[in-house]
């Protein structure tokens, strides 16, 4: 695996692969890699000849300086994992490489509406930082396809919209959330949990599945449903931060025409903010099929 910290030599290698007719897949990460990231790599292999990954803890998307400082950095272990997955290239720029004139003078990419609703409302500027760094990385790597996890549902929607709006010739592939055996969505932040917190963390996914089961049974008093779910989290000493039920396509409030909804959840467990989501099919046929599957599992 070739490792580059600067843009120009990386671009030269990319040009060589392009001249050879190679199709390039890109996986941008912030490091501290886990099985979810490696699943992105394996998915990318199905779509391209060359796999390029990046590790960059992007200061522009952090609202809290302490959060940025405490973000886990495990570059040596990350390199070992990517090498074992036969990744062809790793890009590890510094903030000075990505933002040579500083954050204040950096041109930004802002995706309207999506960047300011839901999680964007409580984390102002976060998604602007995400779209800016991803757009810049796309310009540097020039991939044919890019893979992102569906765990960050709003981020995936944001990037897809940016690619459409900016006429970028890139296929954006969403990859299903990878979970621990107890249901917790894999995340780099999970490493910050204490043993006791880790034992309580599956409550987030269980509560989300409970909401889903209620919705599939026809319950649509969403405000009351969210409050009940919040009570379940508090009972396990999780502090609800955000719980939204939205149309999975528009991220707006569900309507009578909504056939696919998404539950978006965030909660604090100690000092760690956990996020998760679950898509819910609301069509009658889908509900009946899922109910039958649940009965078979019993």
Curated annotation (Swiss-Prot):
Localization per record: Cytoplasm
Positions of beta-alanine binding: 61
Keywords (A to Z) from UniProt: ATP-binding, Cytoplasm, Ligase, Nucleotide-binding, Pantothenate biosynthesis
One GO location term (cellular component): cytosol
Disulphides: none
E.C. code: 6.3.2.1
Entries under PANTHER family matching the protein: CYTIDYLATE KINASE/PANTOATE-BETA-ALANINE LIGASE, PANTOATE--BETA-ALANINE LIGASE
Annotated protein name in UniProt: Pantothenate synthetase
Provenance organism: Aliivibrio salmonicida (strain LFI1238) (Vibrio salmonicida (strain LFI1238))
Upper taxonomic lineage: Bacteria, Pseudomonadati, Pseudomonadota, Gammaproteobacteria, Vibrionales
């Amino acid at each position: 695996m070739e490792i580059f910290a600067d843009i120009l030599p990386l671009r030269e290698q990319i040009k060589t692969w392009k001249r050879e007719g190679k199709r390039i897949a890109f996986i941008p990460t912030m490091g501290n890699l886990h099985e979810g990231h490696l699943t992105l790599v394996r998915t990318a292999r199905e779509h391209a000849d060359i796999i390029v990954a990046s590790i960059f803890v992007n200061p522009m998307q952090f609202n809290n300086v302490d959060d940025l400082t405490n973000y886990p950095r495990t570059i040596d272990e990350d390199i070992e994992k990517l090498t074992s997955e036969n990744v062809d290239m790793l890009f590890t720029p510094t903030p000075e490489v990505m933002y040579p004139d500083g954050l204040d003078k950096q041109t930004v990419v802002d995706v309207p509406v999506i960047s300011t609703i839901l999680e964007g409302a409580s984390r102002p500027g976060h998604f602007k930082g995400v779209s800016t760094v991803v757009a810049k990385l796309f310009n540097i790597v020039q991939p044919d396809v890019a893979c992102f996890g569906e765990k960050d549902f709003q981020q995936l929607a944001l990037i897809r919209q940016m690619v459409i709006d900016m006429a970028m010739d890139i296929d954006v592939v969403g990859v299903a959330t990878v979970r621990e055996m107890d249901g917790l969505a894999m995340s780099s932040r999970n490493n910050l949990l204490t043993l006791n917190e880790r034992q309580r963390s599956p409550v987030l996914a269980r509560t989300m599945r409970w909401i889903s089961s209620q919705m599939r049974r026809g319950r649509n008093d969403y405000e009351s449903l969210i409050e009940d779910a919040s009570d379940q989290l508090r009972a396990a000493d999780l502090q609800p931060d955000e719980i939204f039920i939205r149309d999975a396509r528009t991220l707006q409030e569900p309507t009578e025409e909504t056939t696919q909804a998404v539950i978006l959840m965030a909660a604090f467990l100690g000092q760690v903010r956990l996020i998760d989501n679950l898509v819910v099919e609301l069509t009658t046929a889908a509900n009946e099929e899922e109910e039958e599957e649940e009965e078979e599992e019993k």
